[in-house]
Amino acid sequence: MWESICLTLAATAGNNIGKVLQKKGTIILPPLSLKLKVLRAYAENKPWALGFLMDIVGALLMLRALSLAPVSVVQPVSGCGLAILSVFSHFYLKEVMNVFDWIGITVAGIGTIGVGAGGEEQEASLISVFQLLWLALVVAILFVLLNAWLHIFKRQRREQELGEYEVVEEIIYGLESGILFGMASVVSKMGFVFVEQGFSTMFIPMCISISICCSGTGFFYQTRGLKHGRAIVVSTCAAVASIVTGVVAGMFALGEKLPTSPSGRLLLLLGWLLIMLGVVLLVTSSRLIRHLPRSFRRSRQTSLERGFNIRRTTSHTPKDTNPSAVIQAATLHHLLSSPSKDKD
């Protein structure tokens, strides 16, 4: 179990850090196209090439983790990638982090330990075709309802000539993308389960292809939400929906079960909750910090910087203690998902 958790952490770290490096490399690169000159420029850019390689390795490690452990364990642990990205951005990109960022990282880390301590090795159970069809039907109906609800709010916004997105629209885009991300992990795991039950190995590439389609569609919905909506709402809903979908669908469609011992069951459930809480804190930290007294914000920031030996330049004067003056590490991951924001 711990091997699969370590693989998941390494995979999600590779995916998230790889995207940061690719983002850093594209600053001086032209828009990506199929022209040979452009492709050569991307390949010769060391940050982008290294980020792309880390992203690919992360995807392969995630597939390995899914082949060893239940989706109900892998998917929640993958949410800790945001915590790893925050630490990387803090030390490598020199981004300032507030007290809620560190609390979120700590809580997510404790949740990961809980999942590892409570999780149990499980034997592959028979996959019911009826359950798979029922799951596909439920997801399809859910998307029809969400899109119908979205269409209603869009029409009302146009009739009232409102320029900004309603919060319901942001929530819907976040839920749709998160559900698809969770289903992508479930479908990938399904291929390995089919092979374990004696089916053809062709099920693995077939399920992985379907998983890629789910992830791509999820990024499409997330990008639409991030383009006009607030990243804090879209990203929070996507993160929570991804974890919940992976857990519920894994147990329903793949026959995954909770640990048999009461203590293991408690640790696993507590780990799930702590990981989700940590992710929510990381995403909402820039908003939460604004509700603290200014004096407390300044004192906490000073103590954290002293504890972690942050090198402050002369530009980081007290006027920059306002969290809106810097890019928060927790929101950086979600900004990368929007191609429309590559050009500033």
UniProtKB/Swiss-Prot annotation:
Which InterPro entries does this UniProt record tie to the protein?
Mg_trans_NIPA
Q: Which GO terms describe its biological process?
A: magnesium ion transport
**Mind listing the UniProt keywords for this protein, alphabetically?**
Cell membrane, Endosome, Ion transport, Magnesium, Membrane, Transmembrane, Transmembrane helix, Transport
| Domain of life assignment | Eukaryota
Q: Name one GO cellular component term.
A: early endosome
Q: Does the keyword Transmembrane apply?
A: yes
Task: Tell me which parts of the chain lie in the Cytoplasmic compartment.
Answer: 1-46, 89-98, 147-166, 213-231, 287-344
Topological domain (Extracellular) residues are: 120-125, 188-191, 253-265
SUPFAM superfamilies under this entry? Multidrug resistance efflux transporter EmrE
Membrane topology term reads: Multi-pass membrane protein
- Predominantly, its location class is membrane
Chain segments annotated as transmembrane: 47-67, 68-88, 99-119, 126-146, 167-187, 192-212, 232-252, 266-286
One GO term in the molecular function aspect is: magnesium ion transmembrane transporter activity
Q: Where in the cell is it found?
A: Cell membrane; Early endosome
Gene3D superfamilies on file: 1.10.3730.20
Q: Which family does it belong to?
A: Belongs to the NIPA (TC 2.A.7) family.
- State the oligomer form and interacting partners: Homodimer.
Function summary: Acts as a Mg(2+) transporter. Can also transport other divalent cations such as Fe(2+), Sr(2+), Ba(2+), Mn(2+) and Co(2+) but to a much less extent than Mg(2+).
Q: What is this protein called?
A: Probable magnesium transporter NIPA9
